[in-house]
Amino acid sequence: METFLFTSESVNEGHPDKLCDQISDAVLDACLAQDPESKVACETCSKTNMVMVFGEITTKADVDYEKIVRDTCRGIGFTSDDVGLDADNCKALVNIEQQSPDIAQGVHGHLSKRPEEIGAGDQGHMFGYATDETPELMPLTHVLATRLGARLTEVRKNGTCPWLRPDGKTQVTVEYYNDKGAMVPVRVHTVLISTQHDETVTNDEIAADLKEHVIKPVIPEKYLDEKTIFHLNPSGRFVIGGPHGDAGLTGRKIIIDTYGGWGAHGGGAFSGKDPTKVDRSGAYIVRQAAKSIVANGLARRCVVQVSYAIGVPEPLSVFVDTYGTGKIPDKEILKIVKETFDFRPGMIAINLDLKRGGNSRFLKTAAYGHFGRDDTDFTWEVVKPLKWDKVHA
């Protein structure tokens, strides 16, 4: 049996880039909670003792940006300089302007257009992916790397591993078998965890705790064997972390946010963007399409692409590739997809309820992945029934 290795990585909520994603989405939540028609393009950057929120926001909401910055940093665990940032004493800078009137008239006609008339907020192409290798219909490499990161945060916050600090990264390599285009995981080849820690803990203690409290609860035993390689804090020291260790910026972790390198990516980031930004809403609807194709038994694995022009409601193109795993020809699956899903941005926002903010709705997406999550707020994960002729397939 010929196999190959594939790797995906993830980062914790305390990684500086992810901190920025979460602040940008916390701002989006606050705007949409008060004004569902808010137009938000919110970027965040961070470095030692400083967080800056900047971008273009048109909203009727009364938003305290500085409070959002401090609350988000505090919630992650950045409560003192020695962990990488002090939420209550860092500099919080704000530079927000209104959305360009040129963009506003072309996209939503200064809020005068009906939902079906609303144009894409920009040009671009987005991809959705699904695979039958996990119950979530997501790649195993991505699922495991993401869960390891989430588990690191869990054992830090519940006190199981008190030496942990907020920043951290994970990476998982899986050995796969290609079954006529479908991906079949055979075993976990390598597990890599680099986590921020305090001064008190030894490298041996770090390795033992990570194996017992993080890896063991996350990675199914059937995938681990005596040949599995573990790199646990291989640099030997990771005390300085968060924005103190590295600068952070919104939109720097787009592969972690999606499919861990599987499928494809159009390059657009998600966080801090309202649903007229097709970087986000377009990617969400094609995930729903790809997931529905696999869940309905039309294929074992597939990628769906959609593309847009600024100001134009209808997509320029829709593409489906099932990697040879389709039960019927891809062109027939494409026809079903076009009949089932409405790719116009205004309709995506309605059908996926993307104008509803608050209650950390989008903040939740900004760490540990936008896809494959079991949460009713992740409306794009709902499988739609697809009508096709199984008898003659």
From Swiss-Prot:
Pathway: Amino-acid biosynthesis; S-adenosyl-L-methionine biosynthesis; S-adenosyl-L-methionine from L-methionine: step 1/1. It catalyses: L-methionine + ATP + H2O = S-adenosyl-L-methionine + phosphate + diphosphate. Keywords: ATP-binding, Cobalt, Cytoplasm, Magnesium, Metal-binding, Nucleotide-binding, One-carbon metabolism, Potassium, Transferase. Binds 2 divalent ions per subunit. The metal ions interact primarily with the substrate. Can utilize magnesium, manganese or cobalt (in vitro). PROSITE patterns: ADOMET_SYNTHASE_1 (PS00376), ADOMET_SYNTHASE_2 (PS00377). Its EC number is 2.5.1.6. It holds the Pfam family S-AdoMet_synt_C. GO terms for cellular component: cytosol. The keyword Metal-binding applies. Its cofactor is Mn(2+); Mg(2+); Co(2+); K(+). GO terms for biological process: one-carbon metabolic process; S-adenosylmethionine biosynthetic process. Mg(2+) binds at residue 9. Gene3D superfamilies: 3.30.300.10. It is an enzyme of class 2 (transferase). This is S-adenosylmethionine synthase.
